[in-house]
Every structure is written in structure tokens, then in C-alpha cells.
Amino acid sequence: EDLLNEADEAGVKVVLNATVCGMYQDKEITVRIGDEIHHFKGDSIIIATGAAENMVTFPGWTLPGVIGAGAAQTMMNLHGVKPGSRILMLGSGNVGLVVSYQLIQCGCEVVALVDAAPRIGGYGVHAAKVARTGVPFYLSHTIVTAEGDDHVTGVTIAEVDSSFKFIPGTEKHFDVDTKCF
């Protein structure tokens, strides 16, 4: 609400819950707001699409302690709460790398960073910061299962082939209380 007030005071028109259905030259757009169509033209136009986390499903993915990176950031940055003590991160893109580093700064132990891709997906500067803390990277690996009865107590990962199929005999287990992706 404070941000909306600041924008209003700066003369910015904010339109929420709207869909841009046309973009034209000279900074003009057509926007659907509810059942109405509106046309806007301005010196500057900012379109903020919002975001939704991609959920990867695997046995145990609905256990408490399996959380998205955005949820982990909200817990740390907004509520001042550690998402867990021992955390396995799935994803080596910029989000996974940055959130892993934030978790470490928050006092969490990131036991591993896992990605099915054969190469780190994020910027080298972010990967280097995480690597310097001693977090092992498991590339060409993915989650097999999250274990636990009423919350996550462990995660098993395995190496994957070029078709992203598990390679038998490559499983590794980690005792964790949180699995983040």
C-alpha cells in the first residue's frame, strides 16, 4: 500500500489485475481491466508481469519443509525467520544461487545445490559466492524423493543421463529439514 501511495504522489498511474492486449509504437498500449478495454499513452510504460514459482513434483514434494525459493526469501526478508537449518537447494539458475547465498547469510547450512542440467545456469559471480562457502554442486543430478512422515527429514538425489532419466546406483542421501527449489 505504501508503494502505491508513493507511486500516486509521483504522478504514476498504477493499474492492477489488468491484461495488456496490445502494444503499439509511441508508448501506447491497450489494456483489459475487468470487462472494459482501455487505451493508455505515456512518456514511459512499465509492465510488471508478476511471478509464480515453478514446482517440481517428486515423491514427498507435498511434505512440510519442501518450499519454493520465493517462500524462503519471504520468510527471511519479510519475517526474519530461518526457513530451516539444513537445506538442499534444487536449481542452479540465478534464483537458486542467490537464495542459497541468502540462506547461508541467514545462518542456514546449505548441504548441496542440485541441478539436472550439466552446467550451472546462473551467473558465474553468483555461483562463485556459493562455491566459496563450501556448498557442493551436483550437476546432472535431480531429486528422487523427499523423505519424512510429518515433515522433511531427508532428500535422495541421483545422477541423470542426457534424457534426464535416473542412473541406477548413483543415489545420494542428505539429512535435511528443508528442501528448497
Model-derived regions, located:
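FAD-binding core/adjacent interface of flavoenzyme oxidoreductases
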Residues: E1-R86, S163-D177
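A Rossmann-like FAD-binding core segment of flavoenzymes
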Residues: A7-V31, I104-F181
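Generic serine detector
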Residues: S44, S85, S92, S100, ...
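Short, surface-exposed, charged/polar-biased interaction segments
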Residues: L63-V66, G93-G96, G124, A131-G134
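Rossmann-like NAD(P)H-binding beta-loop-alpha module
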Residues: P64, Q73-R119
